Amino acid sequence: MAYVLRFVQRFRAEDEAAFMALEAQFAALERRKRWPRGRRSRPFAGREPVHTLMWECELPTLAAVNDTVAAMAKDPDHARLLRRQIPFFLEAWTEVYEVLDFPGARPARRRRAS
């Protein structure tokens, strides 16, 4: 059973440029450490304000979720970047979702660009 690990970070809008510059460094860190490549997004419309960043990745097991969080938590490079980013946070939290797979259900088809 697969799981989605998601970090949600609401940051001060006036610090967006500095926050995103640090986030780019986190993306580079993921590549260097060969960690799961997260997908970053921000709300365009919805409940969360636009000055919210979501990082998420899909992992095959709950153990893999725990291993990923543990690897990030004990990594000194990650800790250094996080210490620089925390002052911009208004709030941050972690979510874990179970991926639902219904037998016989077909995946959504992608629309072609015109």
Name what the model sees in each region.
Residues A17-F19, V65-D67, G104-R106:
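Short acidic, gly/pro-rich beta-turn/loop elements at beta-sheet edges
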Residues D15-S41, A73, L81:
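Short amphipathic alpha-helical segments
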Residues Y3-F11, R39-A73, R109-R112:
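Short, well-ordered beta-strand segments in beta-rich or mixed alpha/beta enzyme
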